[in-house]
C-alpha cells in the first residue's frame, strides 16, 4: 500500500481540506491511503472520519520559525517511525516548505507542492511566507495546482507556459449539491426564511473572504428589499468583528450566522443567490459547489475565470 502524507493546517471544513476528503472518500484505499500532518493542535471536523477510513493524523509543534529545530526533530522521528512514507504533499501555501524541506532532509523521494491560492495573504507573516516561497523549488520535485492563476503565483509564468506542472481539479461529489426542493423548504421553514430573498455565502471568516465588503453591499441591497436576508456559513477569527459590523450597519436582524456545519451542501438549495467577494482565490471549491446546485453566482474579479462552468 502507498501512504501519502499531506501537510495541512488542520482537517476542518474548509476548501482545501474538503477537496482532499472528496478524493479520499472515493479512491481505492486498499491501494492508497492518505495521512495528514496537521500544524495546529485543535481537532478538525474531519478527524473522526479520517480515522474511520484508515488514515493517520499527526500534529506537529507548529510553524513558528523559532521552533523550527523542534519541528525538524519531530519530522525526523516521524519518518524514522514510519519508513513507508515515500510521498509528502504540502497544501498550506508557502509555509508548506516546512514539511517539504524536512522530507528532503530525510530522503523522501517524492515531494509535491500543491498550489491552491492565486495570491499570498499580506498579513504579519508575509516576510516569512516570501522567504518560504523562495525556497519551494529547491525542496520539491513535483508541482501541482488547482488552476492556472495559482500555478502562476507559486511556480511562475514560465512554468505555466511550458506546462511544467500538473493541474488537479477541485472535484466535488456532484450528487450531494444538486438542487432539492424538499431540502430548500425544510431549511427555509426552520430558519424563518420562507418568502425571503436569500443571499448565501460559504467561507472562513478571514480577511481573504472580504466579509466586510459583503456586508456593506448587502446593507445597500437591504434598503431596496425588505425581504432580503444574508446567510453566512463558516467560522473563523473575524466572525465576532463581522457580527459587530452587522450591528453597526443595522442589518443584524437580516443576517443568519450558521457556523461551520456538516450540511453545507444542503444550504445551497436554500439560497437564491451565491456571492463570493474574495480578495484572492485559487479555484474555490464553494464556487463549483454553488454552480452544481444551479445557483446564480456573483464572483469578485479576483476569482479566476476558470471557475465558470457551462
Which ranges hold each PLM region?
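Aromatic "clamp/platform" in nucleotide-sugar-dependent glycosyltransferases that forms part
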Residues: 260, 279
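Nucleotide-activated donor-binding/catalytic signature segment of Leloir-type glycosyltransferases, i.e.
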Residues: 243-259
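A conserved mid-protein helix/loop that constitutes part of the nucleotide-sugar donor-binding site
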Residues: 14-22, 197, 201-220, 237-243
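A short helix/loop element that forms part of the nucleotide-sugar donor recognition site in Leloir-type
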Residues: 75, 178-192
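A short, active-site helix/loop in glycosyltransferases that binds the activated sugar's phosphate group
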Residues: 140-179
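N-terminal strand-loop element at the rim of the active site
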Residues: 2, 6-70, 164, 237-238
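Short His-centered aromatic/hydrophobic patch
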Residues: 90-96, 115
Amino acid at each position: 500500500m502507498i501512504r501519502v502524507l499531506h501537510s495541512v493546517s488542520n482537517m476542518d471544513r474548509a476548501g482545501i481540506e474538503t477537496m482532499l476528503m472528496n478524493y479520499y472518500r472515493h479512491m481505492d484505499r486498499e491501494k492508497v491511503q492518505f495521512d495528514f500532518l496537521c500544524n495546529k493542535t485543535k481537532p478538525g471536523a474531519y478527524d473522526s472520519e479520517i480515522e474511520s477510513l484508515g488514515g493517520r493524523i499527526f500534529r506537529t509543534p507548529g510553524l513558528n520559525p523559532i521552533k523550527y529545530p523542534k519541528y525538524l526533530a519531530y519530522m525526523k522521528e516521524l519518518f524514522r517511525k514510519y519508513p513507508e512514507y515515500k510521498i509528502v504533499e504540502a497544501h498550506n501555501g508557502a509555509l508548506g516548505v516546512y514539511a517539504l524541506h524536512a522530507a528532503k532532509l530525510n530522503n523522501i523521494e517524492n515531494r509535491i507542492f500543491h498550489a491552491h491560492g492565486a495570491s499570498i495573504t499580506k498579513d504579519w507573516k508575509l516576510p516569512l511566507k516570501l522567504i518560504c516561497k523562495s525556497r519551494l523549488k529547491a525542496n520539491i520535485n513535483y508541482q501541482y495546482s488547482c488552476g492556472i492563476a495559482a500555478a502562476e503565483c507559486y511556480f511562475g509564468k514560465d512554468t505555466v507556459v511550458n506546462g511544467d506542472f500538473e493541474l488537479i481539479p477541485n472535484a466535488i461529489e456532484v450528487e450531494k449539491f444538486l438542487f432539492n426542493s424538499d431540502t430548500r423548504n425544510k431549511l427555509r421553514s426552520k430558519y424563518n426564511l420562507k418568502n425571503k430573498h436569500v443571499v448565501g455565502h460559504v467561507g472562513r471568516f478571514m480577511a481573504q473572504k472580504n466579509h466586510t465588503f459583503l456586508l456593506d453591499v448587502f446593507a445597500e441591497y437591504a434598503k431596496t428589499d425588505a425581504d432580503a436576508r444574508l446567510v453566512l456559513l463558516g467560522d473563523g477569527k473575524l466572525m465576532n468583528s463581522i457580527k459587530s459590523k452587522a450591528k453597526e450597519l443595522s442589518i443584524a436582524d437580516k443576517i443568519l450566522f450558521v457556523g461551520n456545519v456538516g450540511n453545507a451542501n444542503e444550504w445551497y438549495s436554500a439560497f437564491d443567490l451565491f456571492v463570493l467577494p474574495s480578495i484572492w482565490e485559487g479555484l474555490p471549491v464553494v464556487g463549483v459547489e454553488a454552480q452544481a446546485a444551479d445557483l446564480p453566482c456573483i464572483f469578485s474579479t479576483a476569482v479566476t475565470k476558470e471557475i465558470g462552468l457551462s
